[in-house]
Amino acid sequence: MRIVFDIGGSVLVPENPDIDFIKEIAYQLTKVSEDHEVAVVVGGGKLARKYIEVAEKFNSSETFKDFIGIQITRANAMLLIAALREKAYPVVVEDFWEAWKAVQLKKIPVMGGTHPGHTTDAVAALLAEFLKADLLVVITNVDGVYTADPKKDPTAKKIKKMKPEELLEIVGKGIEKAGSSSVIDPLAAKIIARSGIKTIVIGKEDAKDLFRVIKGDHNGTTIEP
C-alpha cells in the first residue's frame, strides 16, 4: 500500500519535543516502510500557535501568521527526519512532486506546511490525493472523530465508522484562521470527500502500533465512502 501519515504537531511537540514519542513514531514508520510506501506530513502544534499569538500583538495579517506557522511545521518535520535517519528523504519536502520523487527513491518524504490558508491536515489530504495513496492516517491528540469537541462537551460520543459526508457535517462549518486546531479541518474534510480516500483518525496510543492500525485494528475512527 501507499500510505500518508498526518502527524499533529501537538502530538509530536506537545509543550516541548516529546523525544520518546518521536523515537517511537520514527521506528513505527520505518517498520511500516519496509512493506509499504510511506509519506509523512507534520503539524505545528502549540509551538506554532504561541508564535502566531505573538504575531497578533503586532497586528500581523492572517497570511503572515500562516507563514510563521509553516516555518514551525518544517522545524518539527526536521526533528522527525533526524529520528528517521537514513530512511528519510534528507530535507523537508516542500512540494508534492518532490514527495513523489522521494517515494520513488524508497525514502520517506517528510513535509510541513506549504501554502498560507492550508493547514497540514489539508496538505496531508492533498498529498494523499496527489500520490493516489491507498490510506491516510491522521494522528492527533484526540483519539478519533466525535459528535462534538470532547474537551468541551462531556456528552460527545466517538464515531467508529463514518462516511466523508458525515465528517463534513461535523467539521465543515468551521472558519480556519492561522493556528486553528481541530481533529480534521474543513478543507481537509472536503479533499477527503472528493478523493474518496480511506482515512483513519487515531490518538497517540494507537500510533505506537501502526501495523495494527493500517490493518484496521484501532480505537479511532475509520472514514470511507
Curated annotation (Swiss-Prot):
One of its GO terms (biological process) is UDP biosynthetic process. It holds the Pfam family AA_kinase. Pathway: Pyrimidine metabolism; CTP biosynthesis via de novo pathway; UDP from UMP (UMPK route): step 1/1. It is found in: Cytoplasm. It catalyses: UMP + ATP = UDP + ADP. Mg(2+) 1 binds at D6, T120, D121. This is Uridylate kinase. Gene3D superfamilies: Acetylglutamate kinase-like.
